[in-house]
Amino acid sequence: MTVSFRHGVASGDPYQDSFVIWSRVSDVDGSSASVNWEVSSSPKFKKRTILDSGTISTSSDRDWTVKALPEGLQAGEDYYYRFEVDGVVSPVGHASTLPEQAPSVRMAVLSCANFTNTEFFETYRRVAEIDAQQPYDIILHLGDYIYEYGQGGYPSAESAVENRGFEPDSELLSLDDYRQRYAQYHSDAGLREMRASAPMVTIWDDHETANDSWFGGAENHQSDVEGDWGARRDAALQAYYEWMPIREPALRRD
């Protein structure tokens, strides 16, 4: 089976001279993959327009996700990026650096995205359509990017759209559970289009881990049957960092 980029591309956390770029490879034949990336001033990626490039290794340890931090870019400029493995090229994403000064900022602001509710989840596609006509400077997501419930938890099974149930169909507890839910979310074409259209700035709320979570637990966590809260929380946040185009401690600069 040929390697693919079925979960799309994304960018995020823009600075005046850099931003994070993200993708995920699927159907890898082996225990790891070397992923090439390029950032260009042109969507055609002619050699003279390539401004930064590199290679990143990924594996199942990162759920086959990759992030890069191109630097040395100019403030307030548009850029294009893509990834490549074994001759297979990802979709092209668009990102922009922050301007040195801006009299105004154009943002799309989103939160609380329940995959099973297609009526509201369609908002992602609409954001991408609007961006194509009137580009956003950033896409700001204020959390509840995913929901941790199992089938029938939220919304009720009766209101879930046929063939649009949660994967896995049980409540998320393990790292594999959370990873599977993120993969399901990014099977949505509208979400992929939006993430490729403009840089994202994101924070988590509670449902990225569990409903009404706090340091020592959550309303939707029962330690006697669901295990250690700290292990669940850490698994949830690991998956979040893997799938979101944001800076991690290893990507931060002093």
Feature names for model-found ranges:
Residues 1-254:
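Metal-dependent phosphoester/phosphodiester hydrolase catalytic core
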